[in-house]
């Protein structure tokens, strides 16, 4: 379907010259003089080539139909990451480059939103927060109170983060998947 270029956002998929591109960044630029434009940084889905395009904000762009469905993460092997559609129990192997930075946060049984176009996986969206265990951090020093100073820690998935001084090794914590930031101690 055709849409105005200024309405495109990150994560949308556009059809340009018969090839599909996923939008990495979309910025509307209004110069003091001249016509406003929309600057799009895109990645070709088939081979990962990145391109940058400028469109007049009123120009029509072909937006591809993308289906977003919840899938359950099962396991990872040489073929990629395997997900199951809970409605019809169909399994889908997603390549490593599509999973990208989300890979360390995937846990068996986790429900994610999988975006597909004609059955081809394009992107996955994780839950905003995940609960993980601290496997390594500095010991608690007596007299330290809950202050604004943070100490480095390594999570059970290998990601490094910063946690408050009262958190010890073995503690389960809630982490933001977007940036790996500590939110709170897990309530379980």
From Swiss-Prot:
SMART domains: EFP, Elong-fact-P_C. Keywords: Cytoplasm, Elongation factor, Protein biosynthesis. Pfam families: EFP (PF01132), EFP_N (PF08207), Elong-fact-P_C (PF09285). It is found in: Cytoplasm. One of its GO terms (molecular function) is translation elongation factor activity. InterPro entries: Elong-fact-P_C, NA-bd_OB-fold, Rib_uL2_dom2, Transl_elong_fac_P/YeiP, Transl_elong_KOW-like, Transl_elong_P/YeiP_cen, Transl_elong_P/YeiP_CS, Transl_elongation_fac_P. Its main location: cytoplasm. Pathway: Protein biosynthesis; polypeptide chain elongation. It comes from the Bacteria. SUPFAM superfamilies: Nucleic acid-binding proteins (SSF50249), Translation proteins SH3-like domain (SSF50104). GO terms for biological process: peptide biosynthetic process. GO terms for cellular component: cytoplasm. Involved in peptide bond synthesis. Stimulates efficient translation and peptide-bond synthesis on native or reconstituted 70S ribosomes in vitro. Probably functions indirectly by altering the affinity of the ribosome for aminoacyl-tRNA, thus increasing their reactivity as acceptors for peptidyl transferase. HAMAP family: EF_P. Belongs to the elongation factor P family. This is Elongation factor P. It comes from Methylorubrum populi (strain ATCC BAA-705 / NCIMB 13946 / BJ001) (Methylobacterium populi).
